[in-house]
């Protein structure tokens, strides 16, 4: 879902 994509992006950004 849309939230899954948001979480995915948030995880990547948070990993920086």
UniProtKB/Swiss-Prot annotation:
Pfam families: Antimicrobial20. The keyword Secreted applies. GO terms for cellular component: extracellular region. The lineage of its organism: Eukaryota, Metazoa, Chordata, Craniata, Vertebrata. The modification Leucine amide is found at residue 16. The keyword rRNA processing does not apply. It comes from the Eukaryota. GO terms for biological process: defense response to bacterium. Keywords: Amidation, Amphibian defense peptide, Antibiotic, Antimicrobial, Secreted. It is found in: Secreted. InterPro entries: Aurein_antimicrobial_peptide. Bacteriostatic action for Gram-positive bacteria. Expressed by the dorsal and submental skin glands. Its main location: secreted. This is Citropin-1.2.
């Amino acid at each position: 879902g849309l939230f899954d994509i948001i979480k995915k992006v948030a995880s990547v950004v948070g990993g920086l």
